[in-house]
Amino acid sequence: MGVPLILRKTDFFANAGQAVAVADRYPQNVFAEHTHEFCELVLVWRGNGLHVLNDRPYRITRGDLFYIRAEDKHSYASVNDLVLQNVIYCPDRLKLNVDWASNIPGFNDARGAPHWRLSSNGMGQVRPVITQLEQESLKADQSANEMAELLFAQLVMTLKRFRYATDNPSANEQEALLDKLITALAGSLNRSFVLEKFCEQEQCSERALRQQFRTQTGMTVNHYLRQLRICHAQYLLQHTELMVSEVAMRCGFEDSNYFSVVFNREVGMTPVQWRHRSRKAA
């Protein structure tokens, strides 16, 4: 595999004193694998796509949040009306006396989890902050740099308050119905999920929820769950020695032959071929 593209500071920051900036992706197009000379926060507003981070695939949609380190390699593929924002920053340029490491996973090392979910309430809280931050980052004076860093501190603290682990059902009991559904789907990789039962439990209209989900994500509920399972299968095939039948079971497929058919249709190759190619590429 060739050396990935490196995104340079000089192409994204107005001057050497600027610590934070906003890079919109309206919408995000397919983007080849790359690393950076800076770090970034990625927040997805709507649509869907495949985000491959350090060789691990994630099917992303509304509310997905990533903390990307400079040395991380990632790419975007199979995008469908994917709207996201990148808040980019240079750790060495931050001047505020803030405990950045406690607010930004992986700030000092690779141990922090890169992938989180942000609640609908949290998305509403951070959107105006990002808008303000973007406005300040476009100004060419020192006070604007200082204001942008203050807003960045507010942003990362707000994200910490409202984020939750992708499959943690207890973290968003008071949150919007769509958040609950996406969390429930992420927690159903290895077992069946029945939307009708979910709607009975939440006392909501199944038809209305299906429509809301499709409007916000660009996918049906079943398609999204299938994509989550295929992404998990790709990870297991590359990083474990599990047999294909075992991978199928762990990804919610009782029939390994059916799993292979679905995998081939979604990925363009069989599970065995994927395992061989992904390991060779790594």
UniProtKB/Swiss-Prot annotation:
The places in or outside the cell where this protein is found are:
Cytoplasm
| UniProt superkingdom | Bacteria
Show the InterPro entries listed in the entry.
AraC-bd, Homeodomain-like_sf, HTH_AraC, HTH_AraC-typ_CS, RhaR_RhaS-like_N, RmlC-like_jellyroll, RmlC_Cupin_sf, Tscrpt_act_RhaR
Write one Pfam family the protein is assigned to.
HTH_18
Q: How does it assemble?
A: Binds DNA as a dimer.
Q: Which organism is it from?
A: Enterobacter sp. (strain 638)
| PROSITE patterns in the cross-refs | HTH_ARAC_FAMILY_1, HTH_ARAC_FAMILY_2
Report whether Membrane shows up as a keyword of the record: no
Q: Which residues bind DNA?
A: 196-217, 244-267
Fetch the SUPFAM superfamilies from UniProt: Homeodomain-like (SSF46689), RmlC-like cupins (SSF51182)
Q: Give the main localization category.
A: cytoplasm
Task: Provide the site residues for: Interaction with sigma-70.
Answer: 246
- What gene codes for this chain? rhaR
CDD domains (UniProt xref): cupin_RhaR_RhaS-like_N
Lineage at the top is: Bacteria, Pseudomonadati, Pseudomonadota, Gammaproteobacteria, Enterobacterales
What's its job? Activates expression of the rhaSR operon in response to L-rhamnose.
Q: What is the name attached to this protein's record?
A: HTH-type transcriptional activator RhaR
Report keywords, A-Z.
Activator, Cytoplasm, DNA-binding, Repeat, Rhamnose metabolism, Transcription, Transcription regulation
Gene Ontology molecular functions: DNA-binding transcription factor activity; sequence-specific DNA binding
